[in-house]
């Protein structure tokens, strides 16, 4: 379980995250939403340890992350970054092996356990047939799955994703999010991801945190958070929210505009 309590982050004299408290349990997906500059990526970076925290606590299964070394932290949470930070000359297998760095000796020697973890991660990310391909030969969606596999190879209880569907077409977006949801359930991962597409959030998230100007405005289920009033106010854009007849997920569209493209 990932628990964030009274978290504050500042850039210089400016406080950019203000008293954030939320949690995500094993097997759940928490989506961070909000307009540009709301603090979604900052929150992911604060939890991952790449952005310093001004005050507050971040705990994984009761362990305070600020008390852990870098190597210890890498064994409790893994990050799928926003940008595709992969060297094109590496093979897929080599890139995924980087996720085992915290488990290797100081000489960087891999062992059978590392190799087994990498093979399992490749299988879970549906990349077994790509193991010996160079990163540069892969599509954007495939590279995003390599980053996911690298994170899975860390064998952590918490998974963080920063805008994982950016620059992906609809097919790759839904494939990736379906895979993340499947893995969250099967491996009992606590997943937190920053997202822009609110309709995708509605279908794939168990919990939603709405951030505006570094403040947590709403926290709950998609049905509780993704309401026309909350979203219109946060994004400064009037929207309508209807309920999907089969799944019950909220669906958002611009207010006053219907399927024929004409104003109401």
Where are these regions (language model features)?
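Conserved ABC transporter NBD signature motif
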Residues: 56-64
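Conserved ABC ATPase signature
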Residues: 134-138, 142
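Catalytic Walker B motif of ABC-type/P-loop ATPase nucleotide-binding domains
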Residues: 159-163
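Helix-to-loop junction immediately C-terminal to a conserved catalytic motif
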Residues: 48
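Conserved ABC ATPase "signature" region
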Residues: 97, 112-130, 155
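The feature captures the beta-strand-to-loop junction immediately N-terminal to the Walker
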Residues: 33-35
């Amino acid at each position: 379980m990932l628990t964030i309590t009274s978290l504050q982050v500042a850039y210089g004299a400016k406080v950019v995250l203000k008293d954030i408290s939320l949690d995500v349990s094993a097997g759940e997906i928490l989506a961070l939403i909000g307009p540009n500059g709301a603090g979604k990526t900052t929150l992911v970076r604060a939890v991952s340890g790449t952005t310093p925290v001004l005050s507050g606590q971040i705990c994984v299964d009761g362990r305070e992350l600020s008390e852990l070394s870098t190597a210890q932290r890498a064994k409790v949470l893994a990050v799928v970054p926003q940008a595709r930070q992969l060297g094109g000359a590496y093979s897929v297998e080599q890139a995924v092996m980087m996720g085992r760095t915290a488990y290797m000796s100081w000489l960087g020697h891999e062992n059978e356990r590392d190799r087994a973890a990498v093979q399992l991660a490749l299988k879970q990310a549906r990349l077994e047939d790509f193991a010996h391909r160079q990163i540069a030969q892969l599509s954007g969606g495939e590279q995003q799955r390599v980053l996911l596999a690298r994170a899975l190879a860390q064998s952590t209880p918490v998974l963080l994703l920063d805008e994982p569907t950016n620059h992906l077409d609809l097919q790759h977006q839904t494939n990736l999010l379906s895979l993340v949801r499947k893995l969250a359930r099967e491996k009992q991962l606590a997943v937190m991801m920053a997202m822009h597409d609110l309709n995708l959030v509605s279908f794939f998230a168990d919990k939603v945190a709405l951030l505006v100007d570094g403040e947590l405005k709403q926290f709950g289920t998609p049905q509780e958070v993704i309401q026309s009033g909350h979203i219109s106010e946060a994004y400064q854009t009037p929207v309508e929210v209807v309920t999907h007849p089969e799944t019950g997920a909220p669906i958002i569209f611009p207010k006053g505009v219907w399927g024929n493209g004409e104003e109401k």
